[in-house]
Amino acid sequence: MKIAIPKERRPGEDRVAISPEVVKKLVGLGFEVIVEQGAGVGASITDDALTAAGATIASTAAQALSQADVVWKVQRPMTAEEGTDEVALIKEGAVLMCHLGALTNRPVVEALTKRKITAYAMELMPRISRAQSMDILSSQSNLAGYRAVIDGAYEFARAFPMMMTAAGTVPPARVLVFGVGVAGLQAIATAKRLGAVVMATDVRAATKEQVESLGGKFITVDDEAMKTAETAGGYAKEMGEEFRKKQAEAVLKELVKTDIAITTALIPGKPAPVLITEEMVTKMKPGSVIIDLAVEAGGNCPLSEPGKIVVKHGVKIVGHTNVPSRVAADASPLFAKNLLNFLTPHVDKDTKTLVMKLEDETVSGTCVTRDGAIVHPALTGQGA
């Protein structure tokens, strides 16, 4: 079987869905690996390194994709309306595995059905123990949380750790993290390593212990409401108006003392909740920084702008998009390993063919299109 990895064409995307290590694993499984020329440049992965691992380099995307049985990408393929029609380049009946953004990008899903492409949206991977090694959201969010702190430290005009000198003492930076998921936990850990005093808030009561285990202080809002603020899949629920008001009041007491606020709160399939209002920004210290990791989903702060750094009311608000791509050299191998871990159990060792087992919940939970039809319950109206 042939597996192809094209160059990512969406603006600002430096990641690639392959690494030399994963090429070797795929070859060992019986795959012929075809990578588009220059696909790994943004992630510091050279064509020579991929060739040495066993891959074949194709000069164009069309050459790489035209005969491939399986296609790996980081982001969803582009449609004709977006410019280069990547969907049309994929062989009819092929298998696609990528971050499809299926719940919010219906046009590309419909375009895939027309070519009878079996598409797996890796962002829909079930939150079960067995699937942790396949979870692209966790691997990429972890790096985003790290990078958020580094970006915050860069934009902040002061030092992070406390420094005692003959000329005086420099106080430690105060960091406030909103949302204690994978990104939030890594942000807490990284900020603590840099010497900051770290506070954190989340609607889920279970995150309090996690925050404290990393040396942070948890801001409690409403104990009773927080006990039911988590979905069966482990995600945060959208909270009511009364809770949000209480949360804003509790957080504001810390926000006025905060140097760097990092917001990471997302609700699957819905706009990001507003956690820092414009009124709250006006009460922050001059020179403080907000890093909004949810800017692509509408933002946790309404003043953040996708892809821009703006200054409002004396506060610098950073809206970098696609933050994992800012750590592409580490993000790419992890993404590729997630895809490999998803694919490997379904390769028949005797025939060297890919047979996706539909009874496997990692398969049924991520399969969006099959046999020319949209099959995922969240898109057919049969489930959430």
UniProtKB/Swiss-Prot annotation:
Highest taxon, organism lineage: Bacteria
Gene Ontology terms: biological process: NADPH regeneration
GO molecular function terms listed in the Swiss-Prot or TrEMBL record: NAD binding; NAD(P)+ transhydrogenase (Si-specific) activity; NAD+ binding; NADH binding; NADP binding; protein dimerization activity; proton-translocating NAD(P)+ transhydrogenase activity
Effect of D135N: No effect on interaction with PntB, but hydride transfer strongly inhibited. No effect on the binding affinity to NADH
One Gene Ontology term, aspect cellular component: plasma membrane
Effect of S138A: No effect on interaction with PntB, but hydride transfer strongly inhibited. No effect on the binding affinity to NADH
Gene3D superfamilies: NAD(P)-binding Rossmann-like Domain
Annotated positions binding NAD(+): 127-129, 132-135, 180-182, 202-204, 234, 247, 266
Any Pfam family matching the protein: AlaDh_PNT_C
Reactions catalysed, as given in the entry: NAD(+) + NADPH + H(+)(in) = NADH + NADP(+) + H(+)(out)
EC annotation from Swiss-Prot or TrEMBL: 7.1.1.1
Role: The transhydrogenation between NADH and NADP is coupled to respiration and ATP hydrolysis and functions as a proton pump across the membrane.
Protein name (record): NAD(P) transhydrogenase subunit alpha part 1
Species, as recorded: Rhodospirillum rubrum (strain ATCC 11170 / ATH 1.1.1 / DSM 467 / LMG 4362 / NCIMB 8255 / S1)
Origin organism lineage: Bacteria, Pseudomonadati, Pseudomonadota, Alphaproteobacteria, Rhodospirillales
Gene expressing this chain: pntAA
